[in-house]
């Protein structure tokens, strides 16, 4: 058993490596993304909160390439590069947290409902159908505005209310196809417990799919959080996000005359999300291959 | 056929019931009540208090709920706090704007997505397929608002090709100039929505065509010597459109949904923008009404989709 598992995990890493070797774009994206994460997290470790909260009106809206400010300054006289780093860190943190919750909840619920099926599954699916029909964006925005003492954790919770459904449905569908395979039937007849079949036997077979799904969910969450912050309903004041930086563009004058305040943040979002998508596409191909060859 | 439709409508009743309870409690969570909209600088707070008591805001919740439900069914959702107008009147005006813009964007979306999927599916695995697959995975992943901002920055503010807000220019007079001015104001938001909205149709339609191509009836038709063109148009395309049809109900009701990001960024006064301004102005009766409307449209969309599917696909009727 342990030997088989070991071999399985080895070949997963192996096939991902093979796919990255074939897909140069995904390879570059991976290296790039790792570099971005390292730079952002290491740089922001050395920043104090006063660095990005304090306002210095004398330096307001300095143009790029002014001494000491390579990309200029924003409306609070803060260096754009520093704001980019700290904002990117905050946005990534939120996206990581929501993705983690989404994946844990989605995988557990998806495998359980897909494995047992029956009446509970039917009711559960009706429930998710219903939640998917609700205007989620509007409800999230309302929650953000009416929750007392709103902070980053509340934002993570609010976004997670709706985000788990897609993953749950995907994992459920794949689990249902696995359940009818011989190895599950064999395990059942030999008396393996349901819990063990679900999470030790079926779930590892979905792991590639889960990784591919994770990248897409992560990209989606970056978009959702920065979008909310852009509209002014995301991260609270004092916690800058890439979205709050782009929010400068809502003022037509700032948008046209001071593009350096908002363009860098859009570029960061675009490049990071593109890199994630290219990696995700490569991972999905690996998942499909492994599904097909088994 | 009628049996299917009636059964499906009956299924919607409990859903509507749950939706109304949800929205009702949502409204209760928000500060303010229908009379907040009447408060001005010259109103006596005691008078408003008396009105509240008379309207039964201190009654048990189920009585309040039933009364609220009755009012909602009659289209009475209270007064807007900021605009001092009945909520339904404001929504009505904005809904017209949203409807025309969404209609244009839906038409453009289908115009983009359908040829795209046909080209991709006909050249499965070749560069055309790769190109459109990549395109759709990119538009699916990139947050659309970033793209809208760049579009309005380039075509609206920098090049001045398109207006950057509103639905009609003030100096357009007469029916035809007004019509063209309206279209002109809609083009940028509708086009952007369409460019970023192809992924749903593309995914379903492309995989639909690929699935149908390998079916037995296609092989039979080929063996009989039917021309490849005819097979594709008459047999494959028709069957591959089924998954698109299954979503059509949502497309119809979505015309009134309002696009929050696009309307806010392009300054287009539709329901999405109304929602954001209402939130910023803490206009709670308006917010409640908009959420109720959107939830209802979603349920209606599911209903319409099922009915359309039953109409176009006889297999569903038999089940």
Swiss-Prot record, chain A:
Record localization: Cell membrane
GO cellular component: plasma membrane
Membrane topology reported for the UniProt record: Multi-pass membrane protein
Parts of the chain that traverse the membrane: 27-47, 94-114, 127-147, 151-171, 202-224, 260-280
Coiled-coil annotated residue ranges, if any: none
Gene Ontology terms describing biological process: peptide transport; protein transport; transmembrane transport
Superkingdom of source: Bacteria
This protein's UniProt keywords: Cell membrane, Membrane, Peptide transport, Plasmid, Protein transport, Transmembrane, Transmembrane helix, Transport
InterPro entries associated with the record: BP-dependent_transpt_permease, MetI-like, MetI-like_sf
Domain ABC transmembrane type-1: 88-280
Family classification: Belongs to the binding-protein-dependent transport system permease family. OppBC subfamily.
Subunit record text: The complex is composed of two ATP-binding proteins (OppD and OppF), two transmembrane proteins (OppB and OppC) and a solute-binding protein (OppA).
Job of this protein: Part of the ABC transporter complex OppABCDF involved in the uptake of oligopeptides. Probably responsible for the translocation of the substrate across the membrane.
Protein name: Oligopeptide transport system permease protein OppC
Species for this entry: Lactococcus lactis subsp. cremoris (strain SK11)
Gene for this chain: oppC
Curated annotation (Swiss-Prot), chain B:
Keyword Kinase in record: no
Disulphide bridges, residue numbers: none
Topological type in the membrane: Multi-pass membrane protein
Main location: membrane
Protein location: Cell membrane
Residue ranges constituting the ABC transmembrane type-1 domain according to the UniProt record: 95-305
Any one GO CC term of the record: plasma membrane
Keywords: Cell membrane, Membrane, Peptide transport, Protein transport, Transmembrane, Transmembrane helix, Transport
Taxonomy, superkingdom: Bacteria
Transmembrane regions: 9-29, 99-119, 137-157, 183-203, 248-268, 289-309
Pfam entry (one): BPD_transp_1
InterPro entries: BPD_transp_1_N (IPR045621), MetI-like (IPR000515), MetI-like_sf (IPR035906)
Gene Ontology biological process terms from the UniProt entry: peptide transport; protein transport; transmembrane transport
Assembly mode: The complex is composed of two ATP-binding proteins (OppD and OppF), two transmembrane proteins (OppB and OppC) and a solute-binding protein (OppA).
Family (UniProt): Belongs to the binding-protein-dependent transport system permease family. OppBC subfamily.
Function: Part of the ABC transporter complex OppABCDF involved in the uptake of oligopeptides. Probably responsible for the translocation of the substrate across the membrane. Essential for uptake of peptides larger than three amino acids and for growth in milk.
Protein name: Oligopeptide transport system permease protein OppB
Organism: Lactococcus lactis subsp. lactis (strain IL1403)
Taxonomic lineage from the root: Bacteria, Bacillati, Bacillota, Bacilli, Lactobacillales
